[in-house]
Amino acid sequence: FTQKMLIRQAEHRDIEAIMSIVRSAQLALSELGIDQWQNGYPSTEVIKQDIDCGVGYVACANDGKVVGYEAVVLTGEEAYTQIEDEKWHTSNNYVVVHRLCVLSDVRRSGIAIKLMRFAEEHALKHGIRDFRIDTHEGNVVMRRMLEKHGFSHCGMIYLESGDPRVAYGVEIL
């Protein structure tokens, strides 16, 4: 996938395309035996809320097709106030990426990394240098990508539902 990539704020007209990407990610996780995103999450309502709050972003191919999605949150994450086993690198303000997903046809082509870099740049524009993210313990593809790109394992956090997640962090340079 060598096309140029435009990353822009998601709009309500993107919801159908975003949900198609979400469904393809749910299927991929299911095929890997990972129970992440298997209970109707993220729902259309969650994506609408991201868009309404101004935190949803889409990656678009040259032809305008939406091929990736993420929520870039600069206001913290309630689940990150308690971390088990280890600790966050800093107690500074931080950016969190949620709901990172890429269309199955173009997976493993660097789109997720471009979305992550966009989140870093967005954070830096707001004076934030700490980047945090979490994923399901069984999501080894995501965990490898994070580790490959400088993220360190910081411990375990628990979502509002009580589900555990592996937490990662990195200082944005």
Predicted regions and their residues:
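Conserved catalytic-core motifs of GNAT/GCN5-like acyltransferases
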Residues: 74, 134-135, 147-166
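Conserved acetyl-CoA-binding loop-helix of GNAT-fold acetyltransferases
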Residues: 102, 108-121, 144, 148
